From Swiss-Prot:
Residues that coordinate or bind substrate: N9, W10, K11, G172, S212, G233, G234
Similarity-based family: Belongs to the triosephosphate isomerase family.
Name of the gene this protein is made from: tpiA
Pathway given in the UniProt record: Carbohydrate biosynthesis; gluconeogenesis; Carbohydrate degradation; glycolysis; D-glyceraldehyde 3-phosphate from glycerone phosphate: step 1/1
Native organism: Clostridium botulinum (strain Langeland / NCTC 10281 / Type F)
Catalytic activity: D-glyceraldehyde 3-phosphate = dihydroxyacetone phosphate
One GO MF term attached to the UniProt entry: triose-phosphate isomerase activity
Protein name per UniProt: Triosephosphate isomerase
Main location: cytoplasm
High-level lineage: Bacteria, Bacillati, Bacillota, Clostridia, Eubacteriales
Annotated S-S bridges: none
Protein EC: 5.3.1.1
InterPro entries referenced in this protein's UniProt entry, alphabetically: Aldolase_TIM, TIM_sf, TrioseP_Isoase_bac/euk, Triosephosphate_isomerase, Triosephosphate_isomerase_AS
Length: 248
């Protein structure tokens, strides 16, 4: 049985003070959650948020990292810096990183490998654009992203990582994939993992849905067999809304 995982990607929102307030408000609301709870604030908020969640059931993730240990990469953060802070998870390959910052399946793969070297659990994002879905090449696109993004890993590593399926056309647009579409596509992603690493591994991998997840949509989504959680954007910025999703 896979334990559900619900993660909030705060993107470029919340000052340090606001981030601490949000977590403070969230803690009592989700203390009895039956799923794993993760918040992913900006880098500058990580130390304060990590301090605030101590002793609670909330884990902390970063929104990105570089694949090099150190060096002349102005504005970037190395995995060992996150590890030293006590960060648990790291989002890798989010569609916004792919769209605006030239993230590729190859850099995703380098980051995934490096995350494991530093005891970070990657939340690996994949997803298709509206054009790709309408062109009926969703499966081809996802297969390419997974086969490159997750190549050359050990079975133990693959079992630990989290995959987030985020149909790009449903992010921040208010559009969502139907529950059937999401379930079917996530099932396909699991098949790709099975082809690469075997059925036992594929059965253990947790795959989230991330596309305009709201308190009103989560229950039906989580009732689907293949969906193991959610990567939540805008709705994770309000404690009440995020708690409603976590306590689905």
């Amino acid at each position: 049985m896979r334990t559900a995982i619900i993660a909030g990607n705060w993107k470029m929102n919340k000052t340090v003070k606001e981030a601490v307030e949000l977590v403070k408000e969230l803690k009592p609301l989700v203390k009895d959650a039956k799923c794993d709870v993760v918040v992913c604030p900006t880098y500058v908020c990580l130390p304060a948020v990590l301090e605030e969640v101590k002793g609670s059931n909330i884990k902390v993730g970063a929104q990105n990292m570089h694949f090099e240990e150190s060096g002349a990469y102005t504005g970037e953060i190395a995995p060992k810096m996150l590890e030293e802070l006590g960060v648990h998870y790291v989002i890798i390959g989010h569609s916004e990183r792919r769209q605006y910052f030239n993230e590729t399946d190859e850099t995703v793969n380098k980051k995934v490998k490096k995350a494991f070297e530093h005891n970070l659990i990657p939340i690996v994002c994949c997803g298709e654009s509206l054009e790709e879905r309408e062109g009926n090449i969703t499966e081809k696109v996802l297969e390419g992203q997974i086969k490159v993004g997750l190549k050359e890993l050990s079975k133990e590593q693959v079992e630990k990582l989290v995959i987030a399926y985020e149909p790009i056309w449903a992010i921040g647009t208010g559009k969502t994939a139907t529950d059937e579409q999401a379930n079917e596509t996530i099932g396909y992603i699991r098949t790709v993992v099975k082809d690469m690493y075997g059925e036992n591994v594929a059965d253990k991998v947790r795959i989230q849905y991330g596309g305009s997840v709201k308190p009103g949509t989560i229950k039906a989504q989580m009732a689907k067999e293949e969906i193991d959680g959610a990567l939540v954007g805008g709705a994770s910025l309000k404690a009440e809304d995020f708690a409603a999703i976590i306590n689905y």
